[in-house]
Amino acid sequence: MKNIRFDVEYDGTDFCGWQRQPGGIQTLQGELEAQLGRILQENISLTAAGRTDKGVHARLQVVNFMTGSAMELSKMAHALNSLLPDTVRVSNPHVVPLDFHARFSAKEREYRYFLLEEPSALRCRFTGCSKGSLHIGVMQDAAGLLVGEHDFLLLSKEPADKKNPVCLIKECEWQEENGVFVFRIRANRFLRSMVRYLVGVMIAVGRGRAVPEDLGMLLDDGLMTFPLFPAEPNGLFLWDVSY
């Protein structure tokens, strides 16, 4: 048996998230496993670095799987890309150690969120929208409060995250590039929907509906002083994974 790693890039708009689901629901894991199984004539089970939600994209998702196939890896990747939708591509196939695990071997992950102040018909698949003017200075102040180790349980919608809700944020910042507000966050791990909730909080800050100190109280004291809403999924990308 060999342990194979692929890098995967995808537009998540038309998928119901990464994780395989019953009942014929279209997911990225389900699509990739089905087509790999068709090529290799094996039951394939993929492990991924991040389980992205419905509508979330990936510039770099990392997956691995075990196979007994002797097929040349470049041919395997080419065959897989020929069967996948145009919105999903695999690249960089290579054999990795048997103990490599795309999720648990990862040291850091980076997400980016792309945000517009007003809707765009041409960019709506890949940007969220604040539907109003933003003050990037106070949003950056709020982002600075996130650096370090914090309990993010209130910013997750996954009950299983209660077991270990602490994440170490390594880098976190907002930048404006040609009218697009870009949020970049790098951490050792993330809870489910955590980045979308963080962006939602900072949109509230940027529009004057909250202040950075409200985020501080949420993280330090577990106090919610304003309604929490996750940002739209379409602006979010799994951007990088480090091993």
Swiss-Prot record:
Swiss-Prot/TrEMBL catalytic activity: uridine(38/39/40) in tRNA = pseudouridine(38/39/40) in tRNA
GO BP annotations, alphabetical order: tRNA pseudouridine synthesis
Keyword Disulfide bond: no
Molecular function GO labels: RNA binding; tRNA pseudouridine(38-40) synthase activity
Assembly, per entry: Homodimer.
Protein function: Formation of pseudouridine at positions 38, 39 and 40 in the anticodon stem and loop of transfer RNAs.
Family of the protein in this entry: Belongs to the tRNA pseudouridine synthase TruA family.
Name by which UniProt lists this protein: tRNA pseudouridine synthase A
Taxonomy of the source species: Bacteria, Pseudomonadati, Chlorobiota, Chlorobiia, Chlorobiales
